[in-house]
Design a protein with these regions (language model features):
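Well-ordered beta-strand positions in beta-sheet-rich domains
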Residues: 43, 68-70, 92-94
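Hydrophobic beta-strand signal
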Residues: 45-46, 59
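Fold-independent oxyanion-binding glycine-rich loops
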Residues: 48-49, 86
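Short beta-alpha junctions and helix-cap segments that line functional grooves
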Residues: 55-58, 69
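Residue-level recognition of conserved beta-strand positions in structured domain cores
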Residues: 70-71, 85
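Short, positionally conserved secondary-structure boundary motifs
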Residues: 1-39, 51-54, 65-66, 75-80, ...
Length: 115
């Protein structure tokens, strides 16, 4: 807790970001991930150099807007990708044009906004 170790200093960029040149921060502006505990106003720490894998939380650009979703690669043999929200009010986004689909970055941390 703050004040317990006054001589220690926590530097977020050193302690939690392994690749500062490829890391960006974005404010979440959607409720599509609330069941995962990610709410509007939270900050997503995004690494553009990470290779996206099945199940990763990613940021991508779909229908002229940035979206934050879970990447589902289990349908690659059927030539499509799904992007899953974490809010039952929203449906998965199906990506049929996988040749031109681009992940903007992989979310490696989120920072919670309390107020």
């Amino acid at each position: 807790m703050a004040g317990d170790h006054e001589d220690e200093f926590f530097d977020f960029n050193v302690s939690m970001v392994s690749d500062p040149l490829s890391t960006f921060y974005g404010r979440v502006d959607t409720d599509q991930m609330i069941e995962e505990g990610i709410h509007p106003g939270d900050i997503a720490v995004i690494n553009k150099a990470e290779e996206p894998k099945h199940g990763d939380l990613i940021v991508t650009f779909v229908n002229n807007e940035f979206v934050i979703r879970f990447l589902d690669l289990s349908h690659l043999e059927d030539h499509y990708i799904l992007l899953h929200p974490s809010n039952r009010r929203y449906s998965a986004i199906r990506i049929n044009d996988i040749e031109n689909f681009e992940v903007w970055g992989v979310v490696i941390w989120t920072i919670k906004k309390w107020r």
